[in-house]
Structure formats: C-alpha cells, structure tokens
Amino acid sequence: MKKLMMIGFGAMAAEVYAHLPQDLQLKWIVVPSRSIEKVQSQVSSDIQVISDIEQCDGTPDYVIEVAGQAAVKEHAQKVLAKGWTIGLISVGTLADSEFLVQLKQTAEKNDAHLHLLAGAIAGIDGISAAKEGGLQKVTYKGCKSPKSWKGSYAEQLVDLDHVSEPTVFFTGTAREAAMKFPANANVAATIALAGLGMDETMVELTVDPTINKNKHTIVAEGGFGQMTIELVGVPLPSNPKTSTLAALSVIRACRNSVEAIQI
C-alpha cells in the first residue's frame, strides 16, 4: 500500500479524498495550524494532520498540493529537498520565474520530481508534443460566470453585479494572468509551461452572465499544424471557483502514482 501526503484540505481536497484509488492510503494532511483540529475531525484518526512538512513521521510515496499558491511557496521546496515527488495543481505559482528556478534546482539536487497537473483543461499533452516540432502561437481564452470571478482582480476591471453580456475584461500574457488572477488562472500557467512559456502565451479572460459553467479554449499553431481545443466544465458545487475536472485531474495523478501503466 503506497502512502500519500496531501497539502491542503478544502473543497477540492475533500473531493480527492473521497475518490482515492484503493492502493493509495492518505497518511498525512498539511494545513495551517489553526485548521488542524477542524480537519482532524473530518478524516480518519489514522491520518496525521500537521502544519509543517518537518512534522511528517514517515516517507510518502506521493505528495499532492491542493491548497493554493501560498501553500506552494511554503511547502513545495521542503518536499523536493527531501527527495519526494510532488504534484502541483496551483501551477500559477510558477509565474514567479525565480521561484520556478529554485524548485527546479532543488529537485535536481535531491533527485526529486515536480509534476504539473493538467487541472481544468484538456490537451496539455498535445501542446507539449507540438512544442517539440516548432510551436509558434498559443492563445488561451477563459470564460466564466460573474459568480466564478467574484473575489478576484476581475472585480476591479468590470462590474460583475451588473454585467449584461459577455465582456472581455483582460488581455495579456500568461504570466500577467497568473499573477493577477491566482485563484482562476492556473490553466493559463499550465498551458504556458507546456508550450511557449509565460511571456509568449496570450490570454483572454471573459465574464458571461448567460452561462453557469466554465469555458476554456486553446488555439495553437505551428509546424505540427493547427489545434483548437474547447472544454465546457462544471464547477464543484462546494466551490464555484474550482473546476470539477481539476479535482479529477488530481485523482488521476494519484491513480497514476500506483499504476504500472500510466496514461
């Protein structure tokens, strides 16, 4: 039985916990110290809830982060320094190029691995493959309901309470999007890191009051030809800012960690 460490225990983490593969046992959950008692009451007593990686009393076979950018900054480097493998869902954190370099160096030094999970989008394998053959242009378009943009930088750019038609409120690079919309733009960062990079991948963000689902579109072209990928995703009922597919992406990564044949 392989052992899992989970960083974070919010809506997405709870979904992942409920659907873990049978051959993977959750043994450690890392949360802020103020949340330890609450989280411990929600999970089995044989799961150790801790506030710091150094408090772990064993060696996890896989670590997943489902806690947001602040948690990545706090814990990811410690995980890699121990030689462990970690999967990140909050890929937008890596818009900080200096931090990305630090993680890469730590992983290389300690024979550790950093997995960037696909999250709420499809086609990352295709973008990554196209990069090998002369990827020239990539644009990501994200469209969500006003409710899904609440609490983000979008509130400073458009009146979410009174928008009456689809409205583009941001156009810029993936790096700019990831820094300004940390809770919403992990998809843009993932596409960028799979392809042309944070400064060459363009992003267009839209609010649409007529929809209640998240729409993601990738348009790419290069030596391989042309590619258009469109996905309409359902948000998690417990958190409208989180894609159900993003949670499923984490579950898939957990399953891959225990399976001999991986897709």
UniProtKB/Swiss-Prot annotation:
UniProt GO MF annotations: aspartate dehydrogenase activity; NAD binding; NADP binding; oxidoreductase activity, acting on the CH-NH2 group of donors, NAD or NADP as acceptor
Annotated Pfam families: Asp_DH_C (PF01958), NAD_binding_3 (PF03447)
Keywords carried by this UniProt record: NAD, NADP, Oxidoreductase, Pyridine nucleotide biosynthesis
EC number: 1.4.1.21
InterPro entries linked to this entry: Asp/hSer_DH_NAD-bd (IPR005106), Asp_DH (IPR002811), Asp_DH_prok (IPR020626), L-Asp_DH (IPR011182), NAD(P)-bd_dom_sf (IPR036291)
Enzyme class label: oxidoreductase
Keyword Hydrolase on entry: no
Active site residues according to the UniProt entry: 216
UniProt record, GO biological process: NAD biosynthetic process
Catalyzed reaction equations: L-aspartate + NADP(+) + H2O = oxaloacetate + NH4(+) + NADPH + H(+); L-aspartate + NAD(+) + H2O = oxaloacetate + NH4(+) + NADH + H(+)
Pathway: Cofactor biosynthesis; NAD(+) biosynthesis; iminoaspartate from L-aspartate (dehydrogenase route): step 1/1
Residues reported to bind NAD(+): 120, 186
UniProt KW Oxidoreductase keyword: yes
Family annotation (NCBIfam families): PRK13303.1-2, PRK13303.1-3
Function: Specifically catalyzes the NAD or NADP-dependent dehydrogenation of L-aspartate to iminoaspartate.
HAMAP family: NadX
Note: The iminoaspartate product is unstable in aqueous solution and can decompose to oxaloacetate and ammonia.
Record-stated family: Belongs to the L-aspartate dehydrogenase family.
The name this protein goes by in its record: L-aspartate dehydrogenase
